[in-house]
């Protein structure tokens, strides 16, 4: 081979290498841009500062279900923001169903803790996910563990005790005479029993769209259960947006 041919071959290799490197660099740049965009979109961002407790009701959604929640009722300050939530924890005074006084002092008089607890109705709203709906739980789960026969309390509610050795031992199902498990019409709660200084607590559950609402209140309140039932209905209705 002539010297001139060797010179041409030698100078040709870098040019071909440079030509191949340009598309590779371009692809790497595009990949970096795409990765940066994906990281920006998916990277978790800290929510904005919570709003003041005395602000107007916040529009929120839980599992797509809309609610209007007064910030003063939100027990967790970081939950006091509009938008999507997985869960909110609320408290309302009973029987007014107003949010607790956000301006009240945090100091409590001796013995006031128990009184404050029983003067409030607690509400938790969560995304239902794969959890069984309350109506299905009543039809398919509770009958496996509850006693067959029901007693009747002086307030007119029927009571079925859960058997010992079951997941719900120490608790009772309490429902009115018109309760129908096939339609969920009527009033039904699951209540723990009082144990010494610890009062029994009742749970009322309802599913709205894909969100579960659980209302907690002292079992002693069931002496006037019709007022409790009406109050729960009014409370849930007040949390729902007006159509």
Model-based region annotation:
Residues 1-20:
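N-terminal Lys/Arg-rich, disordered targeting/topogenic segments
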Residues 21-41:
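Hydrophobic membrane-insertion alpha-helices, especially the h-region
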Residues 41-59:
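Ser/Thr/Pro/Gly-rich low-complexity linker/stalk segments immediately outside membranes or between
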Residues 58-62, 204-206:
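Short acidic-hydrophobic surface loop/beta-edge motif
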Residues 107-196, 200:
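Non-cytosolic head/periplasmic domains of membrane-anchored proteins
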Residues 195-214:
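Extended hydrophobic
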Residues 209-243:
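Surface-exposed amphipathic alpha-helical segments
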